A protein has these predicted regions:
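Generic detector of intrinsically disordered, low-complexity, polar/charged segments
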Residues: 10, 21, 78, 124-127, ...
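Catalytic domains of cell-wall/extracellular-matrix polysaccharide-remodeling enzymes
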Residues: 133-252, 256-259, 264-269
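Active-site beta->alpha N-cap acidic-glycine motif
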Residues: 46, 50-140, 144-158
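Terminal accessory/targeting
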Residues: 1-75, 91-100, 221-270
Length: 270
């Protein structure tokens, strides 16, 4: 009799677990189906219409269910500069009365002194992207990461007589960064920034970049956009700014008074 009861309990447990699993799978499928539908609709619009027309017609209707009293903030961040594209980027930002944040490489700062000075003088956010841009070099020892960003700071000071404690680790702060290296940066007052929206501009066309902003940038009160100093990124920048403004975002530079968003803290969307 006892054996029979145990069998019944086991079968009951299996039945309940199966029901719970089925509900979970159904929910996930429904969620993925909804997300895929939105993405497909966005891509269809891009195929059927001129991208400029879509950008011009983008408005807060997409976010009609969000709280309009909630301030929406966007940070446009640009990696790997300065470069031959920096002046064009700065011109576009100036035309749109927008400030971005530049995470710069040490050797590029040395090559493009005038662009570094202009970034600082025009009030953009200033940060560092390292010296080597190589995970083997960057994380060779527990102090090598800190050494790279201290070198960047020295270079910035030599060019502009200013310093910064904003940093972005190449390829993001996870999964490559050892905890000790991350802690060394934080303990030396560096603010590590990742992103919440990757435009994938390094491998995308202009229209694909804009599509990524349209899709992944919806229904968020605060976004950190990752871009790079690429030709296609320059071409997409004006439309990106228009989308953000049409959706009610205030576009701001990152400063040292803002709490960072990174994958260690867990306040980003990977």
């Amino acid at each position: 009799m006892g054996k029979k009861k145990r069998v019944i309990r086991i079968l009951s447990g299996i039945f309940v677990s199966t029901i719970i699993l089925s509900i979970g799978i159904s929910y996930k499928q429904a969620y993925n189906k909804t997300n895929e539908k939105i993405k497909t609709e966005t891509q269809s619009k891009l195929e059927e219409n001129n991208i400029s027309d879509i950008v011009e017609n983008t408005s807060d209707k997409i976010n009609k269910d969000t709280d309009e009293s909630q301030e929406k903030i966007a940070y446009i961040t640009i990696d790997d500069g300065p470069s031959k594209y920096t002046s064009q980027i700065l011109d576009i930002l100036e035309e749109n009365n927008v400030k971005a944040t530049f995470f710069m490489l040490n050797d590029n700062m040395k090559l493009y002194n005038d662009e570094v000075k202009r970034i600082v003088n025009e009030g953009h956010g200033v940060g560092f992207h390292g010296v080597s841009h190589d995970v083997d070099e960057l994380y060779k020892t527990s102090t090598s990461t800190l050494d790279e960003f201290n070198t960047c700071n020295k270079t910035l000071y030599e060019i502009t007589n200013t310093t910064s404690n904003l940093v972005r680790l190449p390829y993001g702060s996870k999964p490559y960064t050892p905890e000790e290296n991350y802690n060394n940066l934080v303990n030396n007052d560096y603010l590590v920034w990742d992103w919440t929206l990757d435009t994938l501009d390094w491998k995308s066309t202009k229209d694909q970049i804009v599509s990524n902003v349209l899709y992944y940038g919806r229904e968020k009160d605060e976004i950190v956009i990752l871009m790079h100093e690429k030709e296609q990124s320059v071409k997409a920048l004006s439309d990106t700014i228009k989308i953000l403004k049409n959706r009610g975002y205030t576009i701001l530079p990152i400063t040292e008074t803002i709490s960072p968003k990174n994958f260690w803290i867990g306040n980003t969307i990977e």
